[in-house]
Amino acid sequence: MAASRLDFGEVETFLDRHPELFEDYLMRKGKQELVDKWLQRHTSGQGASSLRPALAGASSLAQSNAKGSPGIGGGAGPQGSAHSHPTPGGGESAGVPLSPSWASGSRGDGSLQRRASQKELRKSFARSKAIHVNRTYDEQVTSRAQEPLSSVRRRALLRKASSLPPTTAHILSALLESRVNLPQYPPTAIDYKCHLKKHNERQFFLELVKDISNDLDLTSLSYKILIFVCLMVDADRCSLFLVEGAAAGKKTLVSKFFDVHAGTPLLPCSSTENSNEVQVPWGKGIIGYVGEHGETVNIPDAYQDRRFNDEIDKLTGYKTKSLLCMPIRNSDGEIIGVAQAINKVPEGAPFTEDDEKVMQMYLPFCGIAISNAQLFAASRKEYERSRALLEVVNDLFEEQTDLEKIVKKIMHRAQTLLKCERCSVLLLEDIESPVVKFTKSFELMSPKCSADAENSFKESVEKSSYSDWLINNSIAELVASTGLPVNVSDAYQDPRFDAEADQISGFHIRSVLCVPIWNSNHQIIGVAQVLNRLDGKPFDDADQRLFEAFVIFCGLGINNTIMYDQVKKSWAKQSVALDVLSYHATCSKAEVDKFKAANIPLVSELAIDDIHFDDFSLDVDAMITAALRMFMELGMVQKFKIDYETLCRWLLTVRKNYRMVLYHNWRHAFNVCQLMFAMLTTAGFQEILTEVEILAVIVGCLCHDLDHRGTNNAFQAKSDSALAQLYGTSATLEHHHFNHAVMILQSEGHNIFANLSSKEYSDLMQLLKQSILATDLTLYFERRTEFFELVRKGDYDWSITSHRDVFRSMLMTACDLGAVTKPWEISRQVAELVTSEFFEQGDRERSELKLTPSAIFDRNRKDELPRLQLEWIDSICMPLYQALVKVNAKLKPMLDSVAANRRKWEELHQKRLQVSAASPDPASPMVAGEDRL
């Protein structure tokens, strides 16, 4: 299908209707060359008077170059008009031209402002592009900001979501995007303020207060304050110093802006390595003195004052003469900054007492505004840090399989959070060992410090000097051994720091922040450290708290990854072990060939269709041939195309996977299967069940006690065995028997269901699971009421799936308990085997678990066996066989045998009672004879 041709006019119309799309595209895709072309086109042939650049974050300064336009005090020019009216917005009122003084860059004292060159405009544009918050007034932006959140915010989020891959990281980033924006108000023009200063000082002062009260951005607020102070006291330049480090007890005065006047952008006056700021120690120099003592300093000639430092003048080439310095206090009276005005205009005249009074009135408002801006900045910083921590959690959940990848993500996040030059992660070789030894180290260098940042991440396997320093880092070893963080502000002044190794490495370390990495068990698994903040300052308490919180999540992520690696190795070991066990747990080829070639006796010869079949009549090999005959007699080999060799191998392997316990062994499994075969063929239940269901119950009977350990489900729960932990406490052994059966079927050459269709296979596996789980007596008690009610009312309909389900469950239980339906000698012998196995479990409960076993498991109460057998028959067996006889009368011989065996147990019980009444001595001959049962 051919793509439709786009019309440029339609695209332009669309962008006009959706300016936010164009803005978003420009900010993401725009290049410097495009900005240069735009500036050249809009400035050529028009002169500088057509430009009205808005300095980012500052008051809107009208810098038109209307030649011949004097200032307010300079007289009227050719274009002056006595009828012109000032406009508070700094623009044109409807039909009224601007006053010449406002259109010019004049300040009211006759001096002209500096013109904004194209280079400066480009720098200003680049700075504004890097700043996320719009600090200049834009009518379109303001109108969009006033739209309801549902239209503006959702549109932006949808646009962002549609332009990014739908990953969890991008979705989370969009959801966590701040919904708080700085208020945007149109500032009044500087020349309008000059007019008010001449004609209405009260309104002039209110305008200055209003402009700073609406600004919550500390950068633009500081710039405004300096411009307005210059304007109030007619200073040539002003500087603002804010107090930092008060919380840590190391106060310093740091210039927010230095040497600014109302018309000059920020001058480069760097005295530090990485920033355009001046740091003044507390109490040093005039600025430090004012900050420490809170006094106003007004000096007519700065060079005559010994506190004055002329280094800045030498650096900038500017001559300081008069100076007015005053503290800025917050609402609590604490000094939060110092404002400095330099060289009163004209020609550096001394500042007057009126200047001091004006500043004293204005600076309290500045203090309140600065406090509000600092509070807002702190809240935004905490928001960004919280957002970063949430993104860290997302990163850790996304990657928990590869240690190198997760450490790389951790270090990238750490550099983003703390803005440092280098980040390192060191992992301990043995977390249990008292000797600290790092086995792995990872490092990441910031792009600012490395031209090849993409290749800076590596695992330190090379013998480089820096890698050696990482592994043998004494500070990291101290943190790993003590579990306490270390924050070194000046590495070369700390005795724990190896300055010689630092010099050899070629990387100059100034400050170090190192914290321990803990796992979920509160064990130290390594350390994380960051080096050298990009701004040259040491890491502060806020950095340390953030890094410690960050490392908590990282520790969990690293620990999970290490655990995953351990689990992966364990899984590999288990796979190898299972492969070895499966080799030894499967039958040999010779055994398979033997039974494959053997003649299988007929059903009549084996007597396996007899309900009263002798459970001990066949040896272990004869039971295999009898099982083969059952499969063939039921037509399952032909119906389901079961490979005969596979069937022989499967039966032999099933036999081999029964343990040599007293009762729940291969013979018991075969006897349960034989009784199921007899009931299917003798009672005609083949007509009730489907062929798939018949196959499921026959296989289920043979597999229903696979790998039985001679203990019941209650013992697994009491001992908190591995089986109980794996399968839970509900039908623990039955789930294990089924899973073991599945494992055998999945072994090579053992899948007797290989030729079934996909649906038949799925149905069969579900039926097989139901059949094996049905042998759990807990499930029998849950379902027998439903079965008994169906039988009592005669409402059963074998065409209904649910009726057949409960019927199959009852058949499985009836076959599992089938020994009680056999002749007395067989039934008593089985009871002795069951009791002996129970007694062994009771002995283990007494010796291993320190518990007193119940009567049926207590060897010391074995004389109570007849009574326990009567309770067993009456509560569990008799009701079941009575219900089955009602379903099919051909099972009446089974019920008769149960009744006959009950009479035998009743006789033994009565004899025991008589003997007990005559002689309470438990060593009597009768009681001793009963012990053999």
From Swiss-Prot:
What is the activity regulation comment for this entry? Inhibited by 3-isobutyl-1-methylxanthine (IBMX), zaprinast and dipyridamole. cGMP acts as an allosteric activator.
Give start and end of each GAF domain.
217-370, 402-558
State the protein's name: Dual 3',5'-cyclic-AMP and -GMP phosphodiesterase 11A
Q: Which gene encodes it?
A: Pde11a
Which residues belong to any copy of the PDEase domain? 588-912
Q: What is this enzyme's EC?
A: 3.1.4.35, 3.1.4.53
Phosphoprotein in keyword set: yes
- Per UniProt, where does 3',5'-cyclic GMP bind? 424
Pfam families in the record, alphabetically? GAF, PDEase_I
What cofactor does this chain's UniProt record say it requires? Answer: a divalent metal cation
Catalytically driven reaction(s): 3',5'-cyclic GMP + H2O = GMP + H(+); 3',5'-cyclic AMP + H2O = AMP + H(+)
Query: What is the annotated tissue distribution of the protein whose record heads this document?
Result: Expressed in testis and developing spermatoza.
Q: What happens when the gene is disrupted?
A: Mice live well and have no impaired fertility. They do however display reduced sperm concentration, rate of forward progression and percentage of live spermatozoa. Pre-ejaculated sperm display increased premature/spontaneous capacitance.
What's this protein's function? Plays a role in signal transduction by regulating the intracellular concentration of cyclic nucleotides cAMP and cGMP. Catalyzes the hydrolysis of both cAMP and cGMP to 5'-AMP and 5'-GMP, respectively.
Per the record, the GO terms for biological process are: signal transduction
* Lineage, broadest ranks: Eukaryota, Metazoa, Chordata, Craniata, Vertebrata
Active site positions, chain numbering: 664
Any idea which positions bind a divalent metal cation 2?
705
Q: Does the keyword Aminoacyl-tRNA synthetase apply?
A: no
Q: What is known of its domains?
A: The tandem GAF domains bind cGMP, and regulate enzyme activity. The binding of cGMP stimulates enzyme activity.
Which residues does the annotated region (Disordered) include? 42-121, 913-933
Q: Which positions carry Phosphoserine?
A: 162-163, 239
* Cofactor note (record): Binds 2 divalent metal cations per subunit. Site 1 may preferentially bind zinc ions, while site 2 has a preference for magnesium and/or manganese ions.
Q: Which UniProt keywords apply?
A: Allosteric enzyme, cAMP, cGMP, Cytoplasm, Hydrolase, Metal-binding, Phosphoprotein, Repeat
Residues the entry annotates as binding a divalent metal cation 1 = 668, 704-705, 816
